[in-house]
Each structure stands twice: as C-alpha cells, then as structure tokens.
Design a protein with these regions (language model features):
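Bacterial lipoprotein signal-peptidase II cleavage site
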Residues: 7, 21-43
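Extended ligand-binding regions for polar small-molecule ligands
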Residues: 26, 101-110, 169, 189-190, ...
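Ligand-binding clefts/hinges and TM-proximal coupling segments of bilobed small-molecule sensing domains
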Residues: 27, 58-61, 191-208, 245-249, ...
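Extracytoplasmic small-molecule ligand-binding "clamshell" domains
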Residues: 58-140
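Short helix-initiation/N-cap motifs at beta->coil->alpha
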Residues: 116-128, 171, 188-191, 206-220
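A ligand-binding cleft/hinge motif common to bilobed small-molecule-binding domains
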Residues: 127, 141-149, 197-198, 219-220, ...
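Periplasmic-binding protein-like
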Residues: 159-166, 234-275, 294-310
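Flexible hinge/capping segments at coil-to-helix
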Residues: 166-183
C-alpha cells in the first residue's frame, strides 16, 4: 500500500475514534443530566408529600370541617330525616320540621350561621359523617358502642328503648308469639335490626331502607309486627287507627344524641357546651311541647326528655 493510502486510512481511523469518543461523552453527559433531573424531581415530590402530610396532620383528617371552617363558610350542614314525623320531616310548606329540627335550627342560630339540611336514611347516618357529606347528624340517632367506634356522639337529649307495634287483630305483647312463618319489619341500620338479629335470630326480618317503605309494608299487613325505637312506633300507633304498641320497652334503655365525624373535637365540644346552656333554659322541654306533645301527651314528657347538664 502506498504511503498516501496509508495516511488516508490513518486519518479516517482517527476521525472515527474522535466521533466515538465525542458520542460517548455526549451520551454520558445526557445520562447524568437525566439522572440529576430525576433526582431533583424525586426530591421535589418527596418534599411535596411531606408538606402535604404535615398539612393534613395540622388540619385533621381532611374529611370533616372544623368549627372555625364552618364559621368561615357561614353555613352548617346537618343530616336529618325527611319522612319521620314528629322528629324530622318536610311539612306541607316544604320546610323541614320536627323535634330534631328544632335543635338543629337552634344550633345554627347560636353558631351564627345558616343551616343546610341533607335528608338521610337510618342506614346512611354513619356514612354521611365518615365521608364529610354533613357536619352533624340529628336524625333520632341512638348511641351505641358499635357506632361510637365510627362517629363521635355529643351529649344526649332524649331517652329511648325499642318497641314493637302490631295490628289490633293480632296484638303482639311478647316476641314468643311470633310464629316461624311470621315476619317482623325493621329498617336497615337501626338498633331494632341489630337487637333482633343478635338476640332473636330465629325471627324472620323483612328489611327496608326507608321509613316510608317500612310504614307502607306494615300498613299492607306484609308482616305481623314492626320493631323500631319505641318513640317512633308509639307515634305511629297514636297517629293511625288499627294498631297497638304491645311491647313498649324491649332491650335496654338507651339515649339519642347528635353525632359528628370521628375526631372532630372542636365541633363536638362546642355542641356540648351549647346544649348545656340549652338544658339550663329547658329548651328540650319547650321543643317537646311544640313538636311531640300532641303525639305522646304530657305523661311521656319527663320520661323521654333529657336536658343536658341538668
């Protein structure tokens, strides 16, 4: 090979080697930049997550609204029944009314905010608090240990037990009268459902999600009896002909109270303080006489009403 050709070959080889080295450096530099960028993004994400976690710890669960947040919004959201006279229902004028609603209105007034009502069914009461759909539940809510694991109960304002209403042509005065083919109506999510399931598993239960559907089924004689809070079955029987509350107290004596989301301490404490003030002014006796007297009469007043702090 001539010297000229050897020189050309050497030049080509040198250029190729240079290109390889430069390409390698460029690739290495790009990889380092990507790595640095990834490390930076990872650090930023970590810092953001830590910040969000710290913020969540400072503000609570993020599900409920604190007392200050409710005040700042100018509105408190309260879950009540819309079809359960005389505790929570919508009257002929389209307004919420009833014993529970009297307390709800007063709490909003004392807090200095408007009230927004959200209609609830018995089975939704815990869920609405757990998801933050409402700030407070005021829907004939019986205090139980099981529920207290999921929500925080305020001080009670009413006494309650379970009761059983039946048709006048077959009055049930003892659960032993219920035959193996008979059914008892209950509403899903109530203490009546829990009690009968645990203590009388042989009794067949016909379950309904809503009070209105349970009432209609019972009126149509789809079951021999209807078990619910005694306050509710007494109200039902007193408001219609053909029914008798043969069992006025079943199980233990319990209480009814407002409930807030688990851990919402600021709202819980404020409600308890306000209810203690209401107890001092006999607010709950006044509310009874306004909304419940025509249903239960004067004889039940001191038995049912609880004045917090008194």
């Amino acid at each position: 090979m001539s010297k000229k050709l050897i020189g050309i070959a050497a030049l080509v080889a040198a250029l190729a080697l240079t290109a390889f080295v430069l390409t390698g450096c460029g690739s290495s530099g790009s990889s380092s930049a990507a790595s640095a960028s990834g490390d930076s993004a990872s650090a930023a994400a970590s810092e953001s997550a830590e910040s969000a976690s710290a913020s969540a710890e400072a503000e609570g669960s993020g599900v409920f609204r604190t007392l200050d947040e409710i005040k700042d919004s100018g509105k408190i959201v309260i879950g009540v029944f819309s079809d359960k006279h005389p505790f929570g229902y919508v009257d002929e004028g389209g307004e919420y009314a009833g014993y529970d609603v009297e307390l709800a209105n007063r709490l909003a007034k004392d807090l200095g905010v408007e009230v927004e009502y959200v209609s609830t069914e018995a089975a939704n009461r815990v869920e609405y608090l757990e998801t933050g759909k409402v700030d407070v539940i005021l829907a004939n809510f019986t205090v139980t240990a099981e529920r207290a694991e999921k929500v925080d109960f305020c001080d009670p304002y009413m006494n309650v037990a379970l009761g059983v209403v039946s048709h006048n042509d077959n009055v049930i005065t003892d659960l032993s009268q219920i035959g193996e083919n008979d059914e008892v109506i209950v509403i899903t999510g109530t203490t009546a459902e829990t009690y009968l399931t645990e203590n009388n598993p042989d009794i067949k239960l016909q379950k309904f999600e809503t009070y209105a559907n349970a009432k209609t089924a019972f009126e149509n004689k789809e079951a021999v009896a209807w078990a619910n809070d005694n306050t509710e079955v007494i109200a039902f029987a007193n408001g219609a002909e053909g029914y008798t509350v043969g069992i006025e107290e079943l199980g233990s004596l319990d209480t009814i109270a407002p409930a807030v989301s688990k851990g919402n301490t600021t709202l819980l404490e404020w409600i308890n303080q306000d209810m203690e003030s209401l107890g001092a002014e006999k607010f709950f006796h006044a509310a009874y006489e306004k909304t419940l007297l025509d249903v239960y009469g004067a004889d039940y007043e001191d038995t049912l009403v609880v004045e917090p702090g008194q």
